[in-house]
Structures are given as structure tokens and as C-alpha cells.
């Protein structure tokens, strides 16, 4: 069986590893480096350069040199992150026909997966050159907080590169595999802090080591898909631009060539300041005006850099707290802290992480290579080369559908081990409804509008029946890659509709943080809203069934009794439109009291059959059946 290679497709750098016997080996590329810059350049000779050759010519070809493409993959053009990147990227980001963020290079429109595929092709060739055989299969890593669209786009990139992606695994989990097989002995609980070039993840992972069989179980994960080394670089670049503008009166932002030189120098200065207290950013002839050439020479201290990025590092701390809480662990339960991603080499990052966990992070795990090594290990597991290893990963956010009253009903909770499958029976909201709309959501809030919409689809051909009688089985199935498949089936007719969720936009930092943090901060208001909707649904159900009973008994009930029950129903309907839960409950009790009295009064006049069919219990939906706010889909004939 041919090798399944492991690829860390990074924002700033990428890395490839293979299993060599029982050890993972990181491979050197054609330039002799163990990591490859995730940079692609399109030259005037229509040549495509990848990695270091692309980086070398970036200063003279800024508009056709692409970097940090991972920040755009699976995102919509209108996303806040994309709009921020448009202002700072030298290349042209455009809106595609489906609303995604694409790149325009020399009047040619390219999708992010197409561009990422060029990097994957280089990784593939590196492995083929080393092994002397064709490579067809790979395990590719993604940030733990990547959503369905971003994971799917990564798989697409692999397919474009000629690879069958056997598994998509989360970067922190891959790092844990690398650590666990090499360094970890015995049972341990570890925290993997992964701050890369464009994304941040934290995962709490339990490693069980029993008779040399190791199980890696992810207990919780959290993160930010738009926080990384690129943001640190941009803070330093902005400082240098403003300092130069104040000193020379010239804004370098209008000069793409100057900005590309500045970006390269800022990145170099940032790296140098991890091992020295001060560095010079020296760029002679950075620009020129009517007075002649201008030179940039600015001293930057480590303290200055730290002051520029301190809030970015602080932003990474809140997800640590949430991940620990979700894992139901305290700081003292963490045995080891693993740092992954090049940005974790910054002393201030290491210091903040050590302060939080009250222990020094391990220094014996290579932050640039651990993820690729873990991907290779997983490849070895899938090919049978690696025995006695079981990986249990999780889904980062809850998944569900919109149900009656605008509530999100969760089918799969966040941090559920994947792959997983869950089904639940829902029903119709209207009499004789023949179609329903399934609205799929992702997030932690109770109200549908506060969560991320992943898509929707229709199930039609439902057999007409009174509301609450139809049985629609909705099934959520998350595969090993974390990609969601949804199906809806009418249990009466057997009709079924299936989709794979492929949302065209990613979950941005604001949305993700808002989903989880708001759920924590607004748990009380969420609970009140949930209780109000529950009472509303109860009132709506009672109003509907009582009106139905009233219609059946209209010939036997006298005018005064009809007037009394109609007044009570009108008051209930008015209360249902308001926000007062207590008032709705009062009006429900009034309707129940009057309707019970009328049914008892008119009981002798009914046949036992009609009595059974009109009893309050018969109109109630089955237990465990959730009322869903499904609207009938009607043909719009013109």
C-alpha cells in the first residue's frame, strides 16, 4: 500500500511528513528546507513560483504574489475579516459570482482552493522525490475552529492538487499525536496552544496509555479563525508606516513596492526580537518625492513590539478559559502545555501562557513541525503502518435546526466526539402542510437569529394531516473530517431529502466569540426566552385544539357559552403576541377552565367516538416530538 502523507497546510508556512518505520520524518523540499513558505507568485513569463522562490521575488512583484490565502478559504467577500484584509493585502481580492472571496491575478479569477492546491502540489512532489513513487493520498490539517465550508474547501484544494484527502484533522490534535507518540508516557491531560500565521486554536486532550495502546481523546476545543502572526506583523507595519509618515511626511501605504519591502522587514524584525532586545528596520531608498529619495531607519525594541501586540495575545486567553470549562477541568488538571505555531516563539506569548496555566510550556516539541508529524501519524494509522493508536476528535460548535418560535433546537452539542450521528422527530406547524423547510444552524444561543445559518433545504410531498401529526425525522451526521450531512425523512411516506452543508462563508472571529461568550454572559436571558417560547407554543397549541373542538361542538353549545369561550380565546391570542409570560400562562388557564367546563357540560350529547377524537389528549402531539416552525412551500405560478 502506498504512503499516506501528512501535510500541515499553514497560513505562513507549510510542512510535509511521512511515516518512516515507526517514526515520522519531516521531509526537506527542493530548496533544502523543512518548511515551505505558503507563498505563490505568478510571473510575467506565466510561470508559477511556490515557496522560497516566490518569496524572493515578492518585492518586485507585489500584486501577483499571494500569501496568507488560508485566511480567505471558505469565506464570503463581505466577511469583516476579508474586508480588513482587502485594505492591507497588495493583491486584489474580488467577489465571485457566488459571493465568495476570490483573487484577481492578471485579469484571471482564482478561487482560494485553486491557489492552495499549488502549495499542496509542491508538498506532494517533495514526497514523491524522496520516496521515488507516486503519491495519491494525504491527511491534511486544518484549524480546530474551521467550519464546514472551510474544511470542504481544504478538501477541494487537495483534490485539485491530485490528492485523495483521506482525512481532515485538527491542527492541535495532530500536534498532540506527535507529542504523545514521541514524548508522552502514561496517562496525561495536555493543553495544545496553537498560534500560527493566521489562526489560533486551543484544545484540551486526554491521552490514555494502556498496555502500549494509546487513545487520544479531545475533551474540548476553542479558538479564533482570524488571529495569528499576520496580525502581529500588521501591527508592526502600521507602527513603522506611522512613524515614517510623522518623520518624513510621506504615507507609504500608497506605494505597494515600499509596503512589500516593509512587510518583509517587519516580519524579520519580529522574529529577531524573540532573541534580542532591539533591532533596526533599515530600508534605504524606500520611496522618493520631489525632494529626492527617502530612507527608513527605525529602531524597534522588544518592549515596543510587545506594547503593539499585547491585546492580540490577551485575545487568546479567553478561549483557554472556555475550553477548560467545557472540558470540566481546572488548571491543576493539565499535566503538560504544548506550544504549536511559529508565533509561539515570541517570549511574551510563552510568558502569558505560562502565567495562565501556572506551568512552563514544554520546549521539546518543534512548533513548526509538530502538526505535520501528527498528520503523518494519522496517515500511518489509516494505512495500517501505525498500530495501537485511536484518535477521538470533536466538533467545535453545536449544530441544530430552527423550530417553532424562532428557537434553535440542538441535535449535536459542541465538543461531541466525531464521527457522530443523531436523529430527532419533528412535526408540522400547520394543518395539511405538504412541505417543510429545514433551516440548519451552528452556535450556542437559544434564538435562531443569534446563531450562524449554515443553509436550508425543503422536504415536500408530505402526506396532508392535522398539525402535529406528521412525523419528520431529521438526522445530523458529522463525518471524520468534521463535515456535516443533513437528511429529513417523512416517516409516513418515506420521502427523504439529503444535503451536505457547504456554507460559502466562514465563521468570523466576531461571530464565533459572540456565539460562545454571549451564551455564557446571556444564559439568564436565554433561559427566559426559552421559557417564554415554551409557554407560547403551549398556548398556541391549546388555542388551536380548543377552536377545533368548538367547531365540532358548535351545534350543541349555546350562544352564551360560545361567547364566553371565544372571549377567552381572543384574550389568549392577544397575550401570545406579547412578551409577558405570566399573562400568557393566566390566559391559558382561563381557556382550559372554560373549555373543560363546556366539554363536561356537553358530554352526554356526544358519541364515544367523537368524544375520543375531540378529547384534549388526542390533539396533543406525541411525546418527544418538537413543534417545528416549518412553512409550506407553495408553487409560485405566474
UniProtKB/Swiss-Prot annotation:
PANTHER family named in the record: HEAT SHOCK PROTEIN 70KDA
Compositionally biased spans, kind Low complexity: 608-619
Region (Disordered): 598-638
A molecular function (GO) term: ATP-dependent protein folding chaperone
Record family assignment: Belongs to the heat shock protein 70 family.
Organism of derivation: Buchnera aphidicola subsp. Baizongia pistaciae (strain Bp)
SUPFAM superfamilies for the chain: Actin-like ATPase domain (SSF53067), Heat shock protein 70kD (HSP70), C-terminal subdomain (SSF100934), Heat shock protein 70kD (HSP70), peptide-binding domain (SSF100920)
CDD domains: ASKHA_NBD_HSP70_DnaK-like
Entries under Pfam families matching the protein: HSP70
Modified residues (Phosphothreonine): 199
Function: Acts as a chaperone.
Key word ATP-binding present: yes
InterPro entries assigned: ATPase_NBD, Chaperone_DnaK, Heat_shock_70_CS, HSP70_C_sf, HSP70_peptide-bd_sf, Hsp_70_fam
Alphabetically ordered keywords of this record: ATP-binding, Chaperone, Nucleotide-binding, Phosphoprotein, Stress response
Source organism, top-level taxon: Bacteria
Induction and repression of expression: By stress conditions e.g. heat shock.
PROSITE patterns, per the entry: HSP70_1, HSP70_2, HSP70_3
Protein name, as recorded: Chaperone protein DnaK
